[in-house]
């Protein structure tokens, strides 16, 4: 069973994570008008994962994105 979890983790890190977001440092997040924090507010969206432990890059949502769905 342990090998199954190991393979699942490798698959996630190799295929799924790079397709959804990238690891960025705090300076790159700031250049994209975001901030590295633990949780995004409801008025913000996640754009990347910061290289800092357990932090994500959050930026403000545009009003057009709220009405999209």
Curated annotation (Swiss-Prot):
InterPro entries: Beta_defensin_dom (IPR025933). It is found in: Secreted. It holds the Pfam family Defensin_beta_2. GO terms for molecular function: CCR6 chemokine receptor binding; chemoattractant activity; lipopolysaccharide binding. One of its GO terms (biological process) is negative regulation of lipopolysaccharide-mediated signaling pathway. Keywords: Antibiotic, Antimicrobial, Defensin, Disulfide bond, Secreted, Signal. Disulfide bonds join 29-57, 36-50, 40-58. Expressed in epididymis, predominantly in the caput (at protein level). Residues 1-26 form the signal peptide. One of its GO terms (cellular component) is extracellular space. Belongs to the beta-defensin family. PANTHER family: BETA-DEFENSIN (PTHR20515), BETA-DEFENSIN 114 (PTHR20515:SF16). Has a salt-sensitive antimicrobial activity against Gram-negative bacteria, including E.coli, Gram-positive, including S.aureus, and fungi, including C.albicans. Binds to and neutralizes bacterial lipopolysaccharides (LPS), abolishing TNF production by macrophages challenged with LPS. Rescues the LPS-induced reduction of sperm motility in vitro and may protect from LPS-induced lethality. This is Beta-defensin 114. It comes from Homo sapiens. The gene is DEFB114.
